[in-house]
Amino acid sequence: MLAVCVSLLALAGCRTESGDSALPRQERLMAVGETKATADSEQALAAEPVSASASSAQAPDSSVAGRALRILSFNVRTWTRDRDADSEVFWRTRMEAMERMIEDLNPDVLCFQEMLFPATRYVPDGYRRVGALNISHPIYVRKGLRARSSEIAIRWQACTVEGVRIINVHSSWDAEITQRTVEQVNAQLTSREPALACGDWNVRLATLQKVGLQMESARVLLGVPEDDTFANFKRPTESHGPIDHFFVRGLTPLSYRQITDSYGCAKMSDHYPILLDIAK
């Protein structure tokens, strides 16, 4: 029985979209390297004691009925080379701040990037994970919402929450990878359900438009000026522009926020979280 369970977990973690098996050798090698780096990072973090969170997400307030979903996208950068507990960017200090932020903002869906296993303990108890267990860009959904997982790939994973297709992306600045990621995201779009794609795309809006992303920027639709979403740890004055994005198709964005409050720590990550309310 134990062997069967292990096999099923391995299959869930290794599931990818049908096109991934045909990835070029260079990207397959890069993916293997990323997996090894993630494993090494998780092993290093696992050596440090982590207390389980006793907090839970607050119940939805009365305003939830007036919108379809609230989505948080956040590259948390769980692991940093600085493992000194007194450091202002110590990973556990930042994850405790992340937990406070989630409880304050009360999202329905959490789309993370660069989240290694120890950091998942800081996701409040009111959420459940949807999709593969071993990827670093997981999706969490508030318990009680209808959600089902679907395709999972190296650079993204998708699920459907309350009839909305949600695609969580962690892409690259590399032009070839950006092109391939956009093509794969476009392939997830159907006429049957509205869609939202979010995450750390690592490139600016103009680049994604140039390579043919078939979705609209929620920030642009709402008339929100662009701002730098990359909060560089080492070079805080260096500007990269907005590289974390929300895109929609068949949905109405209601409000967009870039979260600059650090919730009691110096910086939660080298990216600012972004928050979007949408309606069907």
Predicted regions and their residues:
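Bacterial N-terminal signal peptides
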Residues: 2-10
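N-terminal, active-site-proximal structural segment of metallo-dependent hydrolase catalytic domains
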Residues: 12-121, 280
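Metal-dependent phosphoester-hydrolase catalytic domains
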Residues: 23-60, 151, 160, 175-180, ...
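Structured beta-strand-rich core segments of catalytic domains in phosphoester-bond hydrolases
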Residues: 49, 60-63, 109-176, 254, ...
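A fold-wide structural signal in alpha/beta-hydrolase
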Residues: 70-72, 165-167, 277
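Short hydrophobic/aromatic-enriched beta-strand-loop microsegments
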Residues: 74, 128-133, 215-219
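Active-site metal-binding loops of divalent metal-dependent hydrolases
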Residues: 74-76, 115, 169-171, 199-201, ...
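Solvent-exposed, acidic/flexible segments
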Residues: 87-95, 113-116, 133, 175-179, ...
